[in-house]
Amino acid sequence: MKEFDTICAIATPIGEGGVSIIRISGENVLKIASKIFTPRNKYDIESMKTYTMKYGNIVDLENKKEIIDEVILSYMKAPRSYTGENVVEINCHGGVISTNSVLDQVIKAGARLAEPGEFTKRAFLNGRIDLSQAEAVMDIITAKTELSMKAAMIQSKGALSKEINELRGYLLNVLALIEYAVDFTEDDEDIVDDNLILQIKDGIENTNSKIETLLSNADAGKIVRDGLNIVIVGKPNVGKSSLLNALLRENRAIVTDVPGTTRDIIEEYINLDGIPVKITDTAGIRDTEDVVEKIGVEKSKEKIEEADLIILMLDASRYIDEEDSRIINKIKNRKYIVLLNKMDLKDIKIQEEILKNLSNIINISAKTGQGIDILKDEVKKLFFNGEISSESLIISNARHKQALYKSLENCKMALDKINANEYLDLISIYITAAMKALGEITGDELEEDLLNKIFSEFCVGK
């Protein structure tokens, strides 16, 4: 365990509540606590046993008679704590004043206010967790759905770490074979045994296959972690706001028969079978002289560029006109779903021949709810092949994805060099680079500046 000073921070959200927790971590936690904590039974805090709790008061450091708050103090002895250090947690009354008053006394008694993510950083530096597990902690905190929570929990338990360590083991074995082959050629001045080259190639190809398997769900993983950005577009009065209300199951957007009612962007979040989805209802796209509506139309066009998925709504009770065609041309090279709305009406006029060049067409009625479930299933098909597993490892972190691609690229370069009969010393450079890239995921190979940046994005107290 590394030696650090003693740090403290509020570990619970600031605000009114039943209980707040002040976390203290470091060698001197009991010594600091004994200066400001008075147990009801006159117990010697510095001899407190691990995994026990004591009831008492936090008192003013300079005036022991002044009670700051009534608290419960718990102790976890190193190394069996979150940080791997001695940890004390003070459970005080929730509330801004009471919590900050207790924290002030802890600081006066000798602790330093922790930096963002410093507790988790210490857990990493003390070997309690690796970097991928540390990042999973933040993902758990920010999870938007049960699925994203489960994905983060699987990673926090070391599932990704296990895969990465296995891959590094394969590549380490490849390096050992290369070193043996190099020594063999130096000693015997002979051509390397073909079987040895075959073993080296097999080791690299096996690694490539496993990396590609991990990367196969990376795009879906990003959506599980960060959410899917869906933008609803179409002409005015085709039913975009009605669709938003149907998906939200509440009247969030104003719905009228007057074209151009929605002049600004409306953004809402829904849980689509575990997928966090941000749905944006845009202003109807059309040529207009209205200054305010024109701004809304420009915003709509900007949102189209940012979307993961575009939902184009067409009014099935009208003929497709030039404005519809312009919108169709704008989205046809993107991932999209076309909704033919108002299919509950008897007079359907939309021209089928114009739709022949479009795919993913669904008949719906935003008013009655017809086709809404089909729409949800189609979204899942487009991004998850219709199935989302909550039990398997999902690569959801962009940094992990980038490192895996870097490792894969170096492995492929190594194979190319082998097939070109290049020197084995040159091939070992690519294998070493591939191992280094994998080590960036677990933190075994990472610059301190990048480590500091990763942990700085955590909240204070975690």
Curated annotation (Swiss-Prot):
Binds 1 potassium ion per subunit. This is tRNA modification GTPase MnmE. K(+) binds at N237, T256, V258, T261. GO terms for biological process: tRNA methylation; tRNA wobble uridine modification. Keywords: Cytoplasm, GTP-binding, Hydrolase, Magnesium, Metal-binding, Nucleotide-binding, Potassium, tRNA processing. Residues 227-384 form the TrmE-type G domain. PANTHER family: TRNA MODIFICATION GTPASE GTPBP3 (PTHR42714), TRNA MODIFICATION GTPASE GTPBP3, MITOCHONDRIAL (PTHR42714:SF2). Signal peptide: none annotated. Its cofactor is K(+). The keyword Repressor does not apply. HAMAP family: GTPase_MnmE. One of its GO terms (molecular function) is GTP binding. Its EC number is 3.6.-.-. Belongs to the TRAFAC class TrmE-Era-EngA-EngB-Septin-like GTPase superfamily. TrmE GTPase family. Its main location: cytoplasm. GTP binds at residues 237-242, 256-262, 281-284. Exhibits a very high intrinsic GTPase hydrolysis rate. Involved in the addition of a carboxymethylaminomethyl (cmnm) group at the wobble position (U34) of certain tRNAs, forming tRNA-cmnm(5)s(2)U34. Homodimer. Heterotetramer of two MnmE and two MnmG subunits. It is an enzyme of class 3 (hydrolase). It holds the Pfam family MnmE_helical. Mg(2+) binds at S241, T262. It comes from the Bacteria.
